[in-house]
Structures are given as structure tokens and as C-alpha cells.
From Swiss-Prot:
GO terms for cellular component: cytoplasm; exodeoxyribonuclease VII complex. Heterooligomer composed of large and small subunits. It catalyses: Exonucleolytic cleavage in either 5'- to 3'- or 3'- to 5'-direction to yield nucleoside 5'-phosphates. The gene is xseA. GO terms for biological process: DNA catabolic process. It is an enzyme of class 3 (hydrolase). Keywords: Cytoplasm, Exonuclease, Hydrolase, Nuclease. The lineage of its organism: Bacteria, Pseudomonadati, Pseudomonadota, Alphaproteobacteria, Hyphomicrobiales. Residues 513-527 have a biased composition (Polar residues). InterPro entries: Exonuc_VII_L, Exonuc_VII_lsu_C, OB-fold_nuc-bd_dom. Belongs to the XseA family. This is Exodeoxyribonuclease 7 large subunit.
Length: 527
């Protein structure tokens, strides 16, 4: 009983707190005691800023772990991008979170814990990316000799962009497109990577021209200042770029991972501009020199060809010498053809005249006269036409011969001779066809004459009466008593005297004479 009362008395001397009160008192004590501290540790569990802009991670060493938070305002003021495993020195204040009885550091400033830690992280990242082939020289692209458009990824307000534009304008003015980015701080790496990807995404024929080469540039600075260009996302974007990239980050002694991933590294931004474009004055001077050498070479070449042509021309015979013999043969053939055509026409004309004289009927005579006239006209036209044709061919032949070498001329002469022979054969064939046609027509007229002649009627037993003048008597009323008549029979003629109807006198027989038939031998055959 005594012990219980003593325990009660002791408990009454200790202040009583609620959970909230003790948590608040602890929070105030921690914040008052550790209101401004610097903590060195390794970043653990870093996943980048939250959607709200705040970042939550932890600082640890080999024996303890301290939760940390960076609010959005402080995050934007960091000069580098925090990464997993990076050793840093964080400046801020300790506080507690009553809801879970945890304490944490609210970081206001943070910096890498010395260059050694950053270099170790940089070397480890360099080895890892190198094993993936991102720095392989075999995948490097060549810079275009004369780009049309240059894309520049840098800060729009620094001296770097002014130096680049000024240098390009001095050497070879062209179109420059600037993609503004932050070149320092937490967001510099993602912005540079987005700019490189954005330039590559431009279409070839879009409203914004697609650059032929990219320059990623920044002025000099410390390792922490340039840390955004060691960001893995930047290295991968530059390595995957289809547009050649020139890295111009920092001074000549500075280096970053983007220098290894780029197609070429420039010591300075001004040097990058000089690598990107040639000197226009040098190009013009080179072009003028090459043009002069080309003109001189062409002049020498033309002179050599002219001399060779003249030498070859002196070795060849003249055109008159080459054409003398073919021209003579051609003239002789033309003369023979004209004479042969004239002689042949005369022979045919005499032949037609002979046959025409043997045909007595006027119809046949007139037809033969027409045929003779047609043949004569044809004979007159053919020499003129042939002469005109030969003259035209001779003129064309001479005109072409003046431009041709000996071999084509000889070949053409041979073809002309063959053509003349063909014309000769065609002429003979045409004359033969005319003769055959006239012969057939004469035979048809002869058969027609025999059919229509009165002598064929005499063969059937009829007779024909002629008056004293030898004209046929067509009507009995035209004959008077006492008129001397002759009656022609098939085999001869009988002389009679016309008498009255009442008295008649025996007719005196007169010596009959054979009437030559059209087919008698004295007349001869037409053909």
C-alpha cells in the first residue's frame, strides 16, 4: 500500500503531454537547435522533381540515413542537377514531420562535395556510355561543306550567341536558327536534349527550315557550371541526332561528355562557327583559280585537237579526188540510160508506125494513132523526168559527198548504181507493158473489125451491090435503068447493067477478081 502511494507521488511530478504537444515541442526544439546546418552525404533514392516541382530523396553515409526535401523555389536555383549516388554538401534546417514521427532536412542550397566526387561520377558514366557505343568514332557524321541553315542551341542572352552570329556573318552569311535554352542549372540538361530532338524533328520542307548542322555552345565555367552537359539525356540526344552536331562547351581545356558524343568538338564557340562554314572570299578565290585553270586546259585541249584535225585532213585525199571516178561513172550511166531510152522509144515508135499502116479501118487507125501519141508523149516525158530525177539525185549526191568521207561516198555510189539499174529494169518493164497492152488492144480491134465487116456477111451467101464509083447501093430507088453496077460475092465480082422491070437482058459475065480477105497473106500479120 505504501509502494503504490509512492509511485503515484512520483508520477505527479512529471509533466503530462499529449501526442501532438510532445511532437510540436520536439519540432520546435529541433528547429531551434539545428536551424542552420551543413550536412555532407550521398544522394540516395533521387527520382527527379515531383510533378509539383519539389524533390524528395535522402542523404546517407555508411552508418545513417537522413530524409531530405528541396522545395520548388530552391530547386530552380541549384547550379547543377542532382543525381543518384552523387556526394553533396546540403545547407538547410532540420525539422520534423509530426504525422509520422520522422525528421528531415529542408535543403535550401546544395553543391557537390568537391571536384573529386564529380569526376568519379563522371568517369563511371563515361565508361558506361562508352560500352554502349555512343562515343564510337565509326558513327560520327561528316559536316556539310556548305550548309544552308545552321541551328544553334545556347542561351539567347549571352555573349556566345553574338560571337557565333558575328563570326558566321564575317565568313559566309547564311540562315541561323537559335533554340534558346538554359545552359546552367537543374533544367539545362533536359532543355538542351529537347532542343537537339526538336531540330531533328523538323520536316525537310516545313515552314521552319531544317538545319544542316547543329552547334551546342556555352561559355567557360567550373565543373559544376558545365555539369548539365554531362547529363545522360543530353549525351543520348546528341548521339542519336541525324543532323551533325558540333560541341562548343566551355574553353579549350574544359571537357564534357557531350564533347565525346558530338560529331566534332570545337575549342570555343567562335571555333565552332569557323568549322561550320567556309570563308566566302577563299571560296571565290579558289573558284576563280580553278576557272582560270579550266579555261587554260580547255584552250590547250582545243589547240591539240585542232592540230590533230589539220594533220589528219592533210593526209586525206580531197573530196574532188574521191568523187571524180564515181561522178564519171554516174554521168556515163546517165548518158547511156538517156540514149538507150531514146533509141528504144524510136524503135517502138517505128514498130507501131509499121503496124498502124497495115490497118485500113479508120477506127482502128484512129485508135492506133492515139496509142502512138500516148507512147510518144510517154517517151518524151520519160527522158525529161528521168533527167530531172538524175539531176536532182546528182545534186543531192554532190551535196552529201562534200560532207562525207570516202567510205560512205563509195557505198552511196554503189547504192546509186543499183538504183539506176533498178530504174532501167522498171523502164523496160513499163515499155513492155505498154507494148503488150497495145498488142492486146490491136488484136481486140482486129477481131471487132472482122466481126463488123460486110465480108463476114458475104461468107454466109449474101452479095453487095456497088455503083460505078464503088459506093455501096443501099436502096433500089437510087438505081436507074442502064446504070452500070457490080455485084460482089464471096469469091468474086460480077458487072451488070440495071434494066427495066419488063425487059431484061442477060447479064454479061465479066472477069471476076478475087476479093482479098482481111486474113489474106498479102496484108501480113500485125505482130
Amino acid at each position: 500500500m505504501g509502494s503504490d502511494s509512492s509511485f503515484t507521488g512520483a508520477s505527479s511530478n512529471v509533466a503530462e503531454y499529449s501526442v501532438s504537444e510532445i511532437s510540436g515541442a520536439l519540432k520546435r526544439t529541433v528547429e531551434d537547435t539545428f536551424g542552420h546546418v551543413r550536412v555532407r552525404g550521398e544522394i540516395s533514392g533521387y527520382r527527379g522533381p515531383h510533378s509539383s516541382g519539389h524533390a524528395y530523396f535522402a542523404l546517407k553515409d555508411d552508418r545513417a540515413r537522413l530524409e531530405a526535401v528541396i522545395w520548388r523555389g530552391s530547386m530552380s536555383r541549384l547550379r547543377f542537377r542532382p543525381e543518384e549516388g552523387m556526394e553533396v554538401i546540403a545547407t538547410g534546417k532540420l525539422t520534423t514531420y509530426p504525422g509520422s514521427s520522422k525528421y528531415q532536412i529542408v535543403i535550401e542550397q546544395m553543391e557537390p562535395a568537391g571536384a573529386g566526387a564529380l569526376m568519379a561520377l563522371l568517369e563511371e558514366r563515361k565508361r558506361r556510355l562508352a560500352t554502349e557505343g555512343l562515343f564510337d568514332p565509326a558513327v560520327k557524321q561528316l559536316l556539310p561543306f556548305m550548309p544552308r541553315v545552321i541551328g544553334v542551341v545556347t542561351s539567347p542572352t549571352g555573349a556566345v550567341i553574338r560571337d557565333i552570329i558575328h563570326r558566321i556573318a564575317d565568313r559566309y552569311p547564311l540562315h541561323v536558327i537559335v533554340w534558346p535554352v538554359r545552359v546552367q542549372g537543374e533544367t539545362s540538361g533536359p532543355e538542351v536534349a529537347a532542343a537537339v530532338d526538336g531540330f531533328n524533328a523538323l520536316p525537310d520542307e516545313g515552314n521552319i527550315p531544317r538545319p544542316d548542322v547543329l552547334i551546342v555552345a556555352r561559355g567557360g565555367g567550373s565543373l559544376e557550371d558545365l555539369w548539365g552537359f554531362n547529363d545522360e539525356i543530353v549525351v543520348r540526344a546528341v548521339a542519336a541526332s541525324h543532323i551533325p552536331v558540333i560541341s562548343a562547351v566551355g574553353h579549350e581545356t574544359d571537357w564534357t561528355l557531350i564533347d565525346l558524343a558530338a560529331d566534332i568538338r570545337a575549342p570555343t564557340p567562335t571555333g565552332a562557327a569557323e568549322m561550320a562554314v567556309p570563308v566566302k572570299a577563299d571560296l571565290l578565290a579558289t573558284l576563280a583559280g580553278q576557272s582560270a585553270r579550266l579555261s587554260s586546259a580547255m584552250s590547250r585541249f582545243i589547240d591539240l585537237k585542232r592540230q590533230a584535225h589539220r594533220s589528219a585532213a592533210r593526209a586525206l585525199p580531197s573530196a574532188d579526188q574521191l568523187l571524180a571516178l564515181p561522178r564519171r561513172r554516174f554521168d556515163e550511166a546517165a548518158a547511156r540510160l538517156t540514149r538507150a531510152l531514146f533509141v528504144n522509144t524510136q524503135k517502138k515508135r517505128v514498130h507501131f508506125d509499121g503496124h498502124a499502116r497495115q490497118l485500113s479501118p479508120r477506127l482502128l487507125q484512129r485508135r492506133f494513132t492515139e496509142l502512138q501519141r500516148d507512147v510518144s508523149a510517154l517517151g518524151q516525158r520519160l527522158p525529161r523526168a528521168l533527167e530531172a530525177f538524175l539531176r536532182e539525185r546528182r545534186t543531192a549526191f554532190i551535196h552529201r559527198a562534200n560532207r562525207l568521207s570516202a567510205e560512205p561516198i563509195l557505198r552511196r555510189t554503189k547504192l546509186t548504181s543499183v538504183a539506176i539499174e533498178q530504174l532501167d529494169r522498171r523502164r523496160d518493164q513499163a515499155v513492155r507493158l505498154l507494148i503488150e497492152r497495145a498488142k492486146r488492144r490491136g488484136q481486140e480491134l482486129e477481131r471487132l473489125m472482122r466481126t463488123l465487116s460486110y465480108e463476114s456477111v458475104l461468107e454466109r451467101g449474101f452479095a453487095v451491090v456497088f455503083d460505078e464509083e464503088g459506093k455501096p447501093v443501099k436502096q433500089a430507088g437510087s438505081v436507074s435503068a442502064g446504070d452500070a453496077l457490080s455485084i460482089r460475092f464471096r469469091d468474086g465480082e460480077v458487072a451488070v447493067v440495071a434494066g427495066d422491070e419488063d425487059e431484061s437482058e442477060p447479064a454479061k459475065l465479066v472477069q471476076t477478081k478475087k476479093v482479098q480477105s482481111p486474113g489474106s497473106g498479102n496484108q501480113g500479120s500485125l505482130f
